[in-house]
Design a protein with these regions (language model features):
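A generic secondary-structure signal for well-formed alpha-helical elements
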Residues: 21-25, 69-73, 77-78, 92-104, ...
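Acidic/His/Gly-enriched intrinsically disordered linker/tail segments
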Residues: 80-82, 86-155, 163, 180, ...
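Surface-exposed patches in mature extracellular/periplasmic domains of secreted proteins
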Residues: 23-32, 77-80, 103-109, 171-172, ...
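Stable alpha-helical elements in mature extracytoplasmic
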Residues: 2, 6-13, 57, 61-65, ...
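Juxtacatalytic substrate-recognition/specificity segment
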Residues: 1-81, 92, 143
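Amphipathic alpha-helical substructures
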Residues: 104, 143-219
Length: 219
């Protein structure tokens, strides 16, 4: 049953992301189950942990598919700029639900939950730094890593989308994907694509998030 569900979701994810970001370039996509909850990715294949409840399993299938675009076709420096693939993939997963109402997952609720979770992380755990662009070894633990790369990366992208509008935002992601396929892209490449499309200077704004000088979650 999980295998059939994963197949249907992966097919929907590939169709959605191909439409939004650019065509999936490989002839096949293989999704394999594995023990635990970890996702392992390679070009044209990824694994999904089977020891998860139904909603988390579905999230993992969608996130893994998004990683084929972000971290697969478009490469990133996963050691120093992990927030690129983590944030883009997580936000893509949320957008999948926005574009596929039959999954009955509210995009707006996901964004509210992400904002609340990040705020609690900042106020309750009081990390010394919320900088996104760090070497993996410079994060104190997995929780800090996930909140400062995946969750905060998603929130940054959503904030930019609200600033520039849907049309410019998704056009810029499609342009970014097309121009950087088969390459290793830097954060500057992403934000340059967005700025070029929307005609706004976002460098100081994005830098404040990346360097940890933003006010998200802070009181």
């Amino acid at each position: 049953e999980k295998a059939e569900s994963a197949l249907k979701t992966a097919v929907s994810a590939v169709a959605t992301f191909s439409r939004l970001f650019g065509e999936y370039p490989y002839e096949y996509l293989s999704v394999a189950g594995s023990p635990g909850a970890e996702i392992c990715n390679a070009s044209g294949i990824y694994t999904v942990g089977e020891d998860q409840n139904e909603s988390l399993f579905t999230d993992s299938v969608i996130f893994g598919a998004a990683r084929q675009w972000w971290g697969g076709v478009v490469g990133f420096d996963a050691v120093n700029c992990a927030f690129m693939q983590e944030g883009l993939s997580e936000y893509s997963a949320s957008v999948f639900y926005e574009k596929n109402a039959n999954y009955s997952v509210s995009f707006d609720e996901r964004m509210r939950d992400a904002t609340l979770s990040y705020s609690l992380f900042v106020t309750e755990l009081k990390p010394k730094s919320t900088a996104m662009q760090r070497k993996i070894c410079d994060f104190n633990n997995e929780t800090e890593y996930l909140f400062c790369t995946r969750l905060k990366g998603e929130l940054l992208l959503h904030s930019i989308r609200k600033t520039v509008g849907d049309k410019a935002f998704f056009e810029s992601l499609k342009s970014f994907y097309g121009e950087n396929s088969g390459k290793v892209a830097s954060p500057d490449c992403l934000f340059a694509s967005i700025e070029k499309t929307c005609g706004k200077n976002l460098k100081s704004y994005s830098d404040s998030w990346i360097n940890g000088n933003d006010v998200v979650g802070k009181t």
